[in-house]
Regions:
Chain A
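C-terminal motif of bacterial Sec signal peptides marking the signal peptidase cleavage site
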Residues: 23-26
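Bacterial N-terminal signal peptides that target proteins for export
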Residues: 2-16
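Extracytoplasmic/luminal low-complexity segments enriched in Pro/Gly and acidic/polar residues
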Residues: 223-285
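Secondary-structure edge/capping motif, primarily at the C-terminal ends of alpha-helices
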Residues: 54, 58-68, 72, 109-116, ...
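Extended amphipathic alpha-helical interaction segments
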Residues: 131-245
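N-terminal Sec/ER secretory leader and immediately downstream segment
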Residues: 31-143
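Short, solvent-exposed mixed-charge patches
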Residues: 29-32, 283-285
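Charged, amphipathic alpha-helical oligomerization/scaffolding segments
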Residues: 35, 39-42, 46-49, 53, ...
Length: 285, 103
């Protein structure tokens, strides 16, 4: 009888050890998936903002081209050029929708990775086992509630882990696809930004040339610290002021182009990092 | 493609420089057809890059929606599972109480 009890205890301990090990593995996968989901959410938001901004830049380019056409030819911009620019905006709208779909996917992925379903089910199973235990003829003794509770939690974690791995595999391919597409279009993104800045510089230069620009605000960095403001020019802007404004237009434009290029490269890197993080959750990184 | 786009943009800039250098409106008007063509060439080259990826975007969005639905369904199924066990637990409790009354 003593040997039978010792054997039962050994089996129980072995089963408990397996359950704990299983839970630990599942928790690791869930944590990696939760980290990947957080990173994915962040990068999808960056991507949505990026494409929305680029679409707005193209809208601004249309306005600037219209101004340029009026200044140069006293006529509206050519309708076929406008149509091509509108096509560009439609293409960017597709990319905004794609980035938003990535955001929704990240939310669903995060919901599963952070779901407390395993704990809820474990609690519910524990409750059920307690009720079953109160039925007098049911065999098994006091170990049943604990075992049922832990086993059900382990089972749910196992199901979730398998599903997370499978989903992570699919998501990894999706993010890699988006990253490759983004990288292939980087020259077009940077070029669209450059085009907007350059046409803005042209229009600003022409307006400056026609002396219809108040250059006072450009002097603010020098005057503001001393609570001073520029005095409006009585007749026309001086040559020095115009030269100074031209330099400011050139430099600000160049800075804007450089910053956008850096932001584009940084987003490409972030997409790659998100893809790698999802691969970690797959377990084949 | 980067080089081609850069070349088209440079061509556009060169015509715009020429427009800025014009001294009469007539000179500018003469340049207008070339300017419009250069604008079209550049914008079409940009759109061509985007069109090339259109099928990929459609495919990726479809995959994302499918995976999202699958994840949401499983999350819901797991949540429902807990509810079912709780309901069964309540039923057993009631059954046990009924059985004790019947004794």
């Amino acid at each position: 009888m003593k040997a039978e009890v010792a054997s039962a205890v050994r089996h129980f301990r072995f089963a408990a050890l397996l359950l704990v090990l299983g839970l630990l593995t599942a928790c690791k996968t869930s944590q990696e998936a939760a980290d990947a989901a957080a990173q994915l959410t962040n990068v999808s938001q960056q991507l949505t903002s990026y494409y929305t901004d680029l679409s707005n830049q193209v809208a601004e380019t249309i306005t600037l081209q219209e101004m340029h056409s009026q200044l140069m030819f006293q006529t509206p911009m050519d309708s076929s050029v406008r149509a091509e620019l509108n096509t560009t905006r439609q293409e960017l709208a597709k990319r905004v929708a794609m980035a938003q779909a990535l955001g929704k996917l990240a939310t669903a992925y995060s919901a599963l990775a952070n779901s407390k379903s395993a704990t809820d089910i474990s609690t519910a199973a524990g409750g059920l086992a307690s009720e079953c235990k109160s039925i007098a003829p049911l065999p098994g003794g006091s170990a049943i509630p604990d075992l049922v509770s832990v086993a059900s939690q382990n089972l749910v974690e196992y199901i979730r882990q398998r599903k997370l791995r499978k989903s992570s595999e699919a998501i990894s391919q999706i993010v890699s696809g988006i990253q490759e597409m983004f990288a292939s279009e980087i020259p077009a993104y940077k070029s669209l930004n450059r085009r907007r800045v350059e046409i803005a510089q042209r229009v600003a230069g022409e307006l400056l040339q026609r002396d219809v620009v108040d250059v006072g605000p450009a002097l603010a960095p020098a005057l503001r610290p001393f609570n001073l403001t520029a005095k409006p020019q009585p007749n026309q802007t001086t040559t020095e002021m115009r030269t100074m404004a031209r330099v400011a237009i050139q430099r600000t434009g160049e800075t804007g182009i450089e910053e956008f290029a850096a932001a584009t490269d940084s987003l490409s890197v972030a997409l790659k990092a998100a893809s790698d993080q999802v691969k970690l959750a797959v377990g084949k990184h | 493609m980067d080089d081609a786009l850069g070349a088209l943009q440079a061509q556009l800039n060169a015509i715009e420089d020429a427009l800025d250098a014009c001294t009469t409106q007539d000179q500018r008007n003469q340049l207008r057809p070339s300017y419009i063509q250069a604008q079209l060439n550049y914008q079409r080259a940009v759109n061509k890059i985007f069109w090339a990826n259109d099928p990929k975007i459609t495919e990726l969005v479809a995959q994302m929606k499918q995976t999202q639905t699958s994840l949401q369904e499983l999350t819901q199924e797991l949540a429902d599972f807990a509810k079912i066990i709780t309901a069964v637990s309540t039923a057993v409790k009631i059954g046990t109480e009924l059985a004790s009354i019947a004794k």
